[in-house]
Swiss-Prot record:
Pfam families: PGK (PF00162). One of its GO terms (cellular component) is cytosol. This is Phosphoglycerate kinase. The keyword Kinase applies. It catalyses: (2R)-3-phosphoglycerate + ATP = (2R)-3-phospho-glyceroyl phosphate + ADP. One of its GO terms (molecular function) is ADP binding. It is found in: Cytoplasm. GO terms for biological process: gluconeogenesis; glycolytic process. Its EC number is 2.7.2.3. Substrate binds at D23, L24, N25, R38, H61, F62, G63, R64, R120, R153. InterPro entries: Phosphoglycerate_kinase (IPR001576), Phosphoglycerate_kinase_CS (IPR015911), Phosphoglycerate_kinase_N (IPR015824), Phosphoglycerate_kinase_sf (IPR036043). ATP binds at K203, E325, G355, G356, D357, T358. Keywords: ATP-binding, Cytoplasm, Glycolysis, Kinase, Nucleotide-binding, Transferase.
Length: 400
């Protein structure tokens, strides 16, 4: 990955106006933030810039207002949550451009923090419109992007500003890029990837890219059924995309050509009902009853997965191995997650995980803090795993 500038390259910024792009798209219920994780992630960058005497101006989106103001998508409702995390007062600007923004910025003292209104209240944001980008840039001397989770979008505040102002990566962006470089960019081999989740259709590009980069690809979750069925095995009533049999076969051919071992379940936990503590049994994948569905991979399969984790120097994980939300079909995911966490804690494994369900699964297993890096980025993490260029990253790493 080409070099990118970080906060370490930002010296003597007292009094400078720093436009800091952050991800504050947090869940809100009844006017209260229910999960402040994304605020907590960007807090170190905000605090560092403030401590250095910069005038910190936060740019963020919230929801999908489609280019016009929507009252319940105003960032004003999260101000108190941001202040609580930072333990510092945060001013609010009633627009992100124009006179309200300019007035709010002009009132800042060194070290002050200002949150401007939702950038997506303007159509120019998602269009990456040059005039809108120039209006945003009026209020800054320096641009810092700390929103990796929005880096897959070429919007005005995530990509456009870096063409106008000196551009730097914030601490969250820096940590994410460094972790991803260790995960797939320049990893230590053997590299093992675990990919789970419900559908192959949503992860075709991902699987096609991974087989060319990893030594072993473990496939779990509902998507494993599609690969099993593609080999002519009856999977009963299991979730399965039968119309993607040819795609599954092609992925297996690509893997063989690239020297990547595809690891599929050899046994599974099956049930007739999709509910907690449903009556279940463990069977070979070749003996799934016609009226049953596989909801988790079985103990023999878990042993194989854990053996691959033991062999690995690097692990990239996206998607659970089974229906982890419903016990006892969380057993395989929890077992593999705990094994990977132990190897990581012992310094024997670099483990990088990401994607919404993955983070939930690792939280469920109680091991999020023990993985080398857990990305909360969702779509950007997936596109990175697919080998796609992320506009918000590319613009930071372009030659000056």
């Amino acid at each position: 990955m080409p070099a990118f500038k970080t906060l370490d390259d930002l010296t003597d910024i007292a009094g400078k106006r720093v436009l800091l792009r952050v991800d504050l798209n947090v869940p809100v219920s009844g006017g209260k933030v229910t999960d402040a994780t994304r605020i907590e992630r960007v807090a170190p960058t905000i605090k560092e810039l403030s401590a250095k005497g910069a005038k910190v101006i936060l740019l963020a989106h919230f929801g999908r207002p489609k280019g016009e103001p929507v009252a319940d998508m105003s960032l004003s409702q999260i101000i108190s949550a941001v202040e609580e995390v930072l333990d510092q007062a945060v001013a609010f600007g009633e627009d992100c451009v124009g006179e309200p923004a300019e007035r709010a910025v002009a009132a800042l003292n060194n070290g002050d923090i200002l949150l401007l209104e939702n950038t997506r209240f303007h159509k120019g944001e998602e269009k990456n419109d040059a005039d809108f980008t120039a209006e945003l840039a009026k209020n800054g001397d320096i641009y810092v992007n700390d929103a990796f989770s929005a880096a897959h979008r070429a919007h005005a505040s995530t990509e456009g500003l870096a063409h106008i102002l000196p551009a730097y990566a914030g601490r969250t962006m820096q940590a994410e890029l460094e972790a991803l470089e260790k995960g797939l960019g320049k990893p230590t081999h053997p590299v093992v990837a675990i990919v789970g989740g419900a559908k192959v259709s949503s992860k075709i590009d991902l699987l096609m890219n991974l087989v060319k980069k990893v030594d072993a690809l473990v496939i779990g979750g509902g998507m494993a059924n599609t690969f099993i069925a593609a080999q002519g095995i009856d999977v009963g009533k299991s979730l399965c995309e039968h119309d993607l049999a040819a795609t599954a076969k092609q992925i297996m051919i690509e893997a063989e050509t690239a020297g990547c071992t595809i690891v599929l379940p050899v046994d599974g936990v099956v049930a007739r009902e999709f509910k907690a503590n449903a009556a279940n049994e463990t069977v070979s994948v070749s003996a799934i009853p016609a009226d049953a569905m596989m909801l988790d991979v079985g103990p023999k399969s878990v042993a194989v997965v854990n053996d691959w984790i033991t062999k690995a120097a690097t692990l990239v994980w996206n998607g659970p191995l089974g229906a982890f939300e419903i016990p006892p079909f969380d057993t395989a995911t929890v077992s593999a997650a705990k094994h990977a966490a132990e190897r990581s804690k012992a310094g024997k494994l670099v483990s990088v995980a990401g994607g919404g369900d993955t983070v939930s699964a690792l939280n469920h297993a109680g091991v999020v803090d023990d993985f080398s890096y857990v990305s909360t980025a969702g779509g950007a993490f997936l596109e990175w795993m697919e080998g796609k260029e992320l506009p918000g990253v590319a613009v930071l790493t372009r030659p000056a």
